[in-house]
Amino acid sequence: MAVNARLISKSYLSMFALPGYDAFLGFLLVSAAVPILALVTNKLLAPRSRTGERELTYESGMEPIGGAWIQFNIRYYMFALVFVIFDVETVFLYPWAVAFHRLGLLAFIEALIFIAILLVALAYAWRKGALEWS
């Protein structure tokens, strides 16, 4: 019975073991432990006094002028949103472009559909005036 339990535990462990990934697992554990350790150390060693000067924002060594709550024009957000959309498009299309010669015609058609959808969205935003500053 002890032999069976040993065999079961060995097979159970080998089911989850990924040979060759020990270094990656070690790196993953260390890269997770270092920031956690830094945050805990900061929490334990940081001074706890909250005076008025300590609560001021740092503005290049100068006293802050005016309030920090100002309104930005909504156009900044529209340009940022369009930038993010096309930046994500680049992230999706780069791996496709790298493996283009191996993927074949179907992948090319899928990429064309993806680009067409984004161009329709760009044309819609342009037609609605989202890209005009006036």
Swiss-Prot record:
HAMAP family: NDH1_NuoA (MF_01394). It is a multi-pass membrane protein. Its EC number is 7.1.1.-. It catalyses: a plastoquinone + NADH + (n+1) H(+)(in) = a plastoquinol + NAD(+) + n H(+)(out); a plastoquinone + NADPH + (n+1) H(+)(in) = a plastoquinol + NADP(+) + n H(+)(out). NDH-1 shuttles electrons from an unknown electron donor, via FMN and iron-sulfur (Fe-S) centers, to quinones in the respiratory and/or the photosynthetic chain. The immediate electron acceptor for the enzyme in this species is believed to be plastoquinone. Couples the redox reaction to proton translocation, and thus conserves the redox energy in a proton gradient. Cyanobacterial NDH-1 also plays a role in inorganic carbon-concentration. GO terms for biological process: photosynthesis, light reaction. It is found in: Cellular thylakoid membrane. GO terms for molecular function: NADH dehydrogenase (ubiquinone) activity; quinone binding. The gene is ndhC. This is NAD(P)H-quinone oxidoreductase subunit 3. The chain crosses the membrane at residues 20-40, 78-98, 103-123. NDH-1 can be composed of about 15 different subunits; different subcomplexes with different compositions have been identified which probably have different functions. Keywords: Membrane, NAD, NADP, Plastoquinone, Quinone, Thylakoid, Translocase, Transmembrane, Transmembrane helix, Transport. Its main location: membrane. Gene3D superfamilies: NADH:ubiquinone/plastoquinone oxidoreductase, chain 3. It comes from Prochlorococcus marinus (strain MIT 9303). InterPro entries: NAD(P)H_OxRDtase_bac/plastid, NADH_UbQ/plastoQ_OxRdtase_su3, NDAH_ubi_oxred_su3_sf. One of its GO terms (cellular component) is plasma membrane-derived thylakoid membrane.
